[in-house]
Amino acid sequence: MGTYYIKQKVFSFKDSFSVFDADQQEVYRVKSKLFSLQDRLTITDLNDQPLVEIKQQLAFLKPRYIIEENGQQVAEVTKNFTFFKANFSLKPQNWSLDGDVWSHQYTLTDGNEPLMHVTKKWFTWGDTYEMQIEDESHLLTYIAVMIVLDMVLHNNNGSFSMDGGGGE
């Protein structure tokens, strides 16, 4: 099992995050396009080489994001309509991300098998998420899923939501 932290950079004109390992060593960066009509973020290595693209798809009620590695789609993340909960489905994996938007605790599962547990850290400068990952073979996809969660819960992306998804 591995532990990683996603920390939002506070004083930035665009969405910007750093990903740290359990030893607090930066391992990845996440940057958004400054002037873009749709959310589009890139996960890079420390040399700013792109590894993963996260692209928002236009949707009326259900925010949807495409995650691509090397130009190939690896996942489609869709926010499901729920009251006071976070619930996302991932295709083609059949994974589900569920959690409580008030306590900020989330679990990514494959059926009943937990893949990742996430807790938002309180009293930090900017958003910080702690990720406990069971199997690191999909680490970049897990990081991308957490970035999508943060974007949907904070930005609401123009979608109607009854679950606390309009900012915190």
Regions found by a protein language model. Give the residues of each.
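Intrinsically disordered, low-complexity proline/glycine-rich segments
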Residues: 1-168
